[in-house]
């Protein structure tokens, strides 16, 4: 099996697994810490954070409960562009029962370094009722043969690394390289999805569904985004339309998996 094919299979499996959480089972709340607790907040590794920042954050967490919040506030001043510091500061504040300041820290994490796993995780904590992460683009092909598909491949890899800004950049490049390709245009729309601004993606996918009424990729991803948005009923309709366009294709089978998960609710 080629490395590229393995990447695509992982991306597809991640889409099904993450969406099935929302359709088939209750999503666990990851910020259900509204009261003070003696338990120390976890360290959530971020590969984009410099080693020095990660080390300082770990040292601050080891001081729990005395001095952790103060130390993390100092680190936030020292590292003004670190999403990791603000993610951990928010967790520490939440664990002390200060949910208002925790939310403020998580918003800051998104603002100062949006292209990072910490920013994605901060968004999850701000929206605990939604599936974790962001909806991935799932390709209909298994090997990149064109310039646009190579951009899609790189975008998918960035998504797997929780680098949404870099992924969006690659998907936009794919759309420029193939402006009439529904798959590239769909990826561009998916890359724009943000839990705080979902309209940026839906406002593009809706017109694509009318422009390409039989494009399986459009219907599949519209259904996938609707799952993340929480509109399960409409998601099932879109996934059924995607399946009808080719039940034996990779996307058709994944649509069937999600529909089957939906019936277990």
Segment roles from a protein language model:
Residues 74-75, 108-109, 140-141, 173-174, ...:
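Canonical positions in the second alpha-helix
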Residues 54, 84, 117-121, 149, ...:
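Start-of-helix register in tetratricopeptide repeats
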Residues 53-66, 73, 127, 147-160, ...:
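Alpha-helical adaptor scaffolds
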Residues 36-52, 73-78, 132-150:
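TPR-adjacent "capping" and linker segments in tetratricopeptide-repeat scaffold/adaptor proteins
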Residues 88, 121-125, 153, 187, ...:
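Canonical tetratricopeptide repeat
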Residues 95, 125-132, 160-161, 194-195, ...:
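Register position in tetratricopeptide repeats
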């Amino acid at each position: 099996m080629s490395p590229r094919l393995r990447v695509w299979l992982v991306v597809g499996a991640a889409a099904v697994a993450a969406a099935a959480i929302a359709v088939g089972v209750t999503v666990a709340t990851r910020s259900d810490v509204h009261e003070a607790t003696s338990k120390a907040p976890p360290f959530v590794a971020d590969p984009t954070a410099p080693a020095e920042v990660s080390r300082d954050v770990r040292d601050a967490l080891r001081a729990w409960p005395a001095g952790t919040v103060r130390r993390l506030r100092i680190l936030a001043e020292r590292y003004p562009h670190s999403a990791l510091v603000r993610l951990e500061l928010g967790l520490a504040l939440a664990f002390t029962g200060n949910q208002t300041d925790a939310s403020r820290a998580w918003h800051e994490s998104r603002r100062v370094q949006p292209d990072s796993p910490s920013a994605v995780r901060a968004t999850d904590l701000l929206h605990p009722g939604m599936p974790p992460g962001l909806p991935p683009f799932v390709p209909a092909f298994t090997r990149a043969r064109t310039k646009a598909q190579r951009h899609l491949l790189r975008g998918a890899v960035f998504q797997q690394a929780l680098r949404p800004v870099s992924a969006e950049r690659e998907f936009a490049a794919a759309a420029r390289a193939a402006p009439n390709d529904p798959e590239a245009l769909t990826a561009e729309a998916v890359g724009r999805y943000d839990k705080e601004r979902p309209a940026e993606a839906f406002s593009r996918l809706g017109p694509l569904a009318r422009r390409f009424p039989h494009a399986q990729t459009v219907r599949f991803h519209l259904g996938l985004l609707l799952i993340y948005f929480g509109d399960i009923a409409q998601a099932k309709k879109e996934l059924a339309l995607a399946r009808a366009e080719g039940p034996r294709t990779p996307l058709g089978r994944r649509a069937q998996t999600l529909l089957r998960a939906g019936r277990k609710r």
